[in-house]
């Protein structure tokens, strides 16, 4: 993992972004690409996306720009690109619909917007598959259908339990 600008004892409280809206990938917990040229390109692309869509929500591997009907997940590191590829191609009635979107050479995913449920969840109130999603990252799409919205690392569990 690359070194970050984040102080060693920074209280994250569930956030992975040290400086909200920063375009420096080292200000994100796991930010930065191994290839330095891609890292610089990602930072400038992130700046353009922030100017266009506003401050993103930060995850471990991606910055998520939230629109009215869709979200765009931009990778903050190499793992973020892998996650985007998985979420763009995996199809299930239990997961948010997405499609691959390449922005300035980076694999992103454009995904239907999900109204996120507050965590912690009372898992007993939801279908069994919800237990397979890390941190219960679920919500309802615009049609009122329950879906997982951050599931790239849980795909193997979802396919086994079909």
Name each model-derived stretch.
Residues 2-53:
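Juxta-kinase regulatory segment immediately upstream of eukaryotic protein kinase catalytic domains
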Residues 47-57, 97-100:
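Short secondary-structure junctions
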Residues 51-90:
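ATP-binding glycine-rich loop module of kinase domains
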Residues 59-60, 104, 133-136:
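Short, surface-exposed coil-to-beta transition loops
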Residues 64, 71-73, 110, 139, ...:
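Short hydrophobic-acidic sequence motifs that mark active-site Asp/Glu residues
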Residues 66, 102-103, 140:
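Generic beta-strand structural signal
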Residues 75-76, 87-125:
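Conserved structural core of kinase catalytic domains
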Residues 131-162:
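Catalytic activation segment of kinase domains across protein kinase-like and atypical kinase folds
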